[in-house]
Amino acid sequence: MKKVPLTCDVCGSRNYNVPKQSNLTSRLTLKKFCSRCNAHTMHKESK
């Protein structure tokens, strides 16, 4: 497992580092809280 950063779709800040299995090929998307936007927004895996 390796850690990948999650980036907010709205403001683009990297808020979270989450573990991901290396055998998954699709990009991870989660709804998480963004402290810059002060709201729950979609966060996508960035490289």
UniProtKB/Swiss-Prot annotation:
Highest taxon of the lineage: Bacteria
TM region positions: none
Disulfide bonds: none
GO cellular component, one term: ribonucleoprotein complex
GO molecular function terms listed in the Swiss-Prot or TrEMBL record: structural constituent of ribosome
Gene3D superfamilies in UniProt: Ribosomal protein L33 (2.20.28.120)
GO BP of this protein: translation
Keywords: Ribonucleoprotein, Ribosomal protein
Keyword Ribonucleoprotein among UniProt keywords: yes
InterPro entries xrefs: Ribosomal_bL33, Ribosomal_bL33_CS, Ribosomal_bL33_sf, Ribosomal_zn-bd
Pfam family, one: Ribosomal_L33
Signal peptide: none
Family indicated by similarity: Belongs to the bacterial ribosomal protein bL33 family.
Name this polypeptide is given: Large ribosomal subunit protein bL33
